[in-house]
């Protein structure tokens, strides 16, 4: 005899069993999770100071970062949102010829509450050396001391400042790649939306690495990554609440603060979007790419099986990390050559 059940009765036990299940972590990545500080998995508001201290350390030696390559760094103080000062580090080859180079504008991660430009300087040294680019890293001001719209407006001000000095620094602003990791990925998307809507300097390509896009924290992946991995759903709530306060999750959130809120993603440059299958930002990354495609735009999307948040930088020797980096580098090379 065949037992017939309603759809609701059939689905509810399954949903109850799988509500908090998460995709497995890659076998090369998983052991690292046992060694990370607890606040890298679950960040509570009272741990922000410790998290910030751990993510704002600069390199012990710039010479070690440059490692003998012909790359020079200069710091510049500029005016950010509301008249406050921010610092932009510009990197370029010391043996740069007279030809206009491609440009890279990279925004650091840290969940809107931590990190600094120094976290992306090492990768920019490599990209400047490898691609002959002129690059900039911006130190936007952090929440909760500087809530929305300060971070994204600081990033937009930095973009205007950098592109406005393209001739001085020797790069072609029409060949500019904007990008960022985690919060920096979300801020890159928000900054590009501001450029589109204000008629400002439009990047030629957009690199969103495991981007923080959606303040609502309601996707399946946001529910799955709870007390596990790196940057779980509680961390995400902490970061977004620091940025938005009581507005988090309400209708009173702009598309520039939380780009997943944007219903129209037309007019954006070609995008590269990547995330791990076992991280909070997986589903919002997929949705953002899908919305770009729906608007007739170009997006290359990669969801890496078994990857937790930021696995590419935390365990760079893992096979999946190396595949992810090689795939990303191939895209960057194509974008900067065009």
Residue ranges of predicted features:
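Short beta-strand element of the alpha/beta-hydrolase
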Residues: 100-110
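Short amphipathic alpha-helix adjacent to the substrate-entry channel of hydrolases
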Residues: 118-137
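Gly/Ser-rich "nucleophile elbow"/oxyanion-hole loop immediately N-terminal to the catalytic nucleophile
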Residues: 163-178, 198
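Hydrolase active-site cap/lid region
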Residues: 193-251
């Amino acid at each position: 005899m065949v037992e017939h059940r309603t759809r609701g009765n059939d689905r509810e036990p399954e949903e109850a069993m799988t509500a908090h299940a998460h995709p497995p972590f890659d076998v090369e990545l998983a052991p690292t999770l046992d060694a990370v500080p607890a606040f890298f998995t679950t960040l509570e508001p009272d741990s922000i100071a410790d998290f910030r201290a751990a993510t704002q350390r600069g390199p012990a030696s710039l010479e070690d970062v440059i490692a003998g390559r012909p790359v020079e760094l200069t710091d510049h103080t500029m005016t950010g949102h509301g008249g406050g000062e921010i610092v932009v580090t510009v990197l370029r080859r010391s043996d740069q010829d007279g030809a206009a180079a491609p440009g890279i504008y990279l925004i650091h991660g840290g969940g809107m509450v931590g990190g600094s430009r120094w976290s992306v300087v090492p990768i920019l040294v490599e990209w400047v050396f490898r691609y002959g680019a002129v690059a900039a890293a911006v130190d936007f001001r952090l929440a909760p001391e500087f809530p929305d719209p300060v971070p994204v407006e600081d990033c937009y001000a930095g973009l205007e400042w950098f592109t406005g000095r393209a001739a001085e620094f020797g790069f072609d602003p029409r060949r500019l790649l904007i990008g960022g990791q985690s919060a920096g990925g979300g801020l890159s998307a928000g900054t590009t939306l501001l450029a589109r809507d204000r008629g400002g300097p439009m990047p030629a390509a957009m690199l969103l690495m495991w981007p923080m896009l959606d303040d609502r924290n309601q996707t399946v992946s946001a529910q799955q990554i709870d007390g596990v991995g790196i940057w779980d759903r509680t961390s995400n709530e902490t970061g977004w609440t620091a940025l938005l306060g009581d507005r988090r999750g309400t209708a009173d959130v702009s598309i520039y603060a939380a780009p997943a809120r944007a219903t129209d993603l037309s007019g954006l440059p070609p995008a590269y979007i990547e995330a791990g299958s076992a991280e909070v930002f997986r589903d919002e990354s997929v949705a953002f790419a899908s919305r770009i495609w729906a608007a007739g735009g170009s997006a290359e999307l990669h969801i890496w099986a078994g990857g937790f948040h930021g696995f590419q930088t935390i365990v760079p020797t893992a096979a999946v990390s190396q595949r992810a980096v090689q795939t990303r580098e191939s895209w960057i090379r194509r974008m900067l050559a065009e």
